[in-house]
Amino acid sequence: MGEERYDLEKTYTESFFGWDDNAGEQKILAQYFVPKIVKLFNPKYVLDVGCGSGQWLDEYRKHNIKIKGIEGSSNAWVTMSDETKEVVTQWDLRDTIQEEDYNIDFAQSFEVAEHIEEEYADIFLHNLIKDDPDTVLLTAASVGQHGIQHVNCQEREYWMTKMKNMGYLFNQDLLNEIKSWDRPEACPFWWPQNLMVFI
């Protein structure tokens, strides 16, 4: 099936997950936006696909929300909290997840899709929606957005079409609501630019 896959462990190293700018950015975003997401969507069980070191999961836990994470590189565990390690499964997102359903109602994946080769894009999305969540938040790097192993940068319409074919519709009203929120000074440009909401 196409070219040989790149090695997740060699690409997403301990230094990648321990990189202060990267980890700090995610923590700031999670601390700021999770309370607002909880208020708007009232999730009961959150799945974070490509959860990295689990900063978002840590914040959801503070709101007494059940959490589950999937991460491809074992190097993410180096900076992961002990509590989060218990609920994160290592899995290559280019393969169909074999675990039983988690019965989640809210799924998210932030800046992961562009790291998945295009030939595996549908598998990645199926992993994201495997439990038929009510709501999906997704960001994916757009064309020309540079980053480590950005192998499938696409415009939003690409992901919208794929999600529609899987039964999920892009919701502009909910996206507008989220975009109306104030953003922390450290908020990266990709958060509002790449965000999509599906229901």
Model regions and ranges:
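Conserved N-terminal segment of class I S-adenosyl-L-methionine
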Residues: 1-110, 119-131, 142-146, 150-158, ...
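Short glycine-centered segments of the SAM/dcSAM-binding site in methyltransferase folds
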Residues: 134-137
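A short His-aromatic
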Residues: 115-116
